[in-house]
């Protein structure tokens, strides 16, 4: 998370730190006691055994409970080139135990959820805290969050097209339009985007365009 501030798991008990060979790599949202929602590009092409996730901890590297995976399900229409339908569900090998103010399932927006332009949304995760920085150099060990805003779809599509990226109707754009300095970054992929406490999006991609445009 770039441009945000530290937070605690008590504020976001639905979020999970996804670990690739025991190192924080992506984020996720608890769906129920056996499933976690994330971005398809996180585990795509990997063995389930190479991933695990930590719940119930503000720190990505310690505390809470670590669960291994039994399998993961990539959205059948996921496109690795355009990142359309960039969502996946991870199945745990053991039940997730819900704990008040630390571990609970997220509230997921339904198909008819109405989200207008310029609405306040919040992103949370353990990604790098420096634009262009790597997780190794700028790890987000403690959970962070940032307030951003939804961006008009047509505006988003036009601006991304100028740098050769496709924005489909399945995508939601958010950021700080024409100001920048706040957003999700490397390592936040798969984590939630909240609108009034409801998960309305899964972090899919971050580009340098955000620094000057979003």
UniProtKB/Swiss-Prot annotation:
It holds the Pfam family Trypsin. One of its GO terms (molecular function) is toxin activity. Hemolymph and saliva of the larval form (caterpillar). It is found in: Secreted, Extracellular space. Keywords: Disulfide bond, Fibrinolytic toxin, Hemostasis impairing toxin, Hydrolase, Protease, Secreted, Serine protease, Toxin. Residues 1-214 form the Peptidase S1 domain. Its main location: secreted. One of its GO terms (cellular component) is extracellular region. InterPro entries: Peptidase_S1, Peptidase_S1_PA, Peptidase_S1_PA_chymotrypsin, Peptidase_S1A, Trypsin_dom, TRYPSIN_HIS, TRYPSIN_SER. Disulfide bonds join 26-42, 156-173. Its EC number is 3.4.21.-. Gene3D superfamilies: Trypsin-like serine proteases. CDD domains: Tryp_SPc. The keyword Secreted applies. It comes from the Eukaryota. The keyword Iron does not apply. One of its GO terms (biological process) is proteolysis. Sensitive to serine proteinase inhibitors and thiol proteinase inhibitors. Belongs to the peptidase S1 family. Fibrinolytic activity; shows preferential cleavage of Arg-Gly bonds in all three fibrinogen chains. Contact with the caterpillars causes severe bleeding, due the anticoagulant effect of the protein. This is Achelase-2. It comes from Lonomia achelous.
